[in-house]
Amino acid sequence: MPLEIKWASTENNEVSDLLVVKLAENPDLVKAGIKIQRDAMSFDELLNWLYRDASQDAKYGVPTYNMFNLATGFTPWYDQKYTYSTKEEMIKMGYNTNYIFDKELEQAATDMVMVAPDQRDAFKDNFVKFVTRWNEMLPDLPLYSNQYHDFYNSKLKHWVTSEMKGLTATILDAW
């Protein structure tokens, strides 16, 4: 039986077009028995499918797609406790868009971030437990991410950014 993946993709998107060539039409995937069906749609519709938003239309509440190509900006705060929450109220707020309900993964994600800042060894141990369980479940398969760079005129003074300091704070300090 082949692995069939239903892919919700945004229309007029160069990355989606590249993924068609690299994934959907990849002869190695075809040989392995993997079939990827792309459905191109507007970004708003893709989000309705991602969040299973039946308030927009009952069809969105029915799990249909198991692949979405959306970029992510990785933050320096590696806190996944809500990303893999099994709590119904968190899911209603838009967390756990993978709909992977695994108590062990949720607990590992929570344990990882609930240690005191000076407990580095405990954090490392918990991180390994989380990543091990994450790899067993493989709820996400990252294909690409955003990387941000700042380019500015050398006349600009006090433009100091970091992964911890947002754009709005940076603008306020610059002149």
PLM segments and residue spans:
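Soluble non-cytosolic domains of exported or imported proteins
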Residues: 10-18, 41, 96-103, 117-125
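Solvent-exposed loop/turn segments at secondary-structure junctions
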Residues: 10-15, 43-45, 72-77, 148-151
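Append "and occasionally in soluble cytosolic enzymes with long acidic Gly/Pro-rich linkers
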Residues: 1-26, 129
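Sec-exported extracytoplasmic/periplasmic mature domains
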Residues: 24-34, 51, 55, 73, ...
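Short, solvent-exposed loop/beta-turn-alpha elements that line the ligand-binding surface or hinge
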Residues: 1, 49-59, 82-115, 145-175
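Surface-exposed patches in mature extracellular/periplasmic domains of secreted proteins
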Residues: 34-41, 122, 140, 145
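Periplasmic binding protein-like
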Residues: 29-90
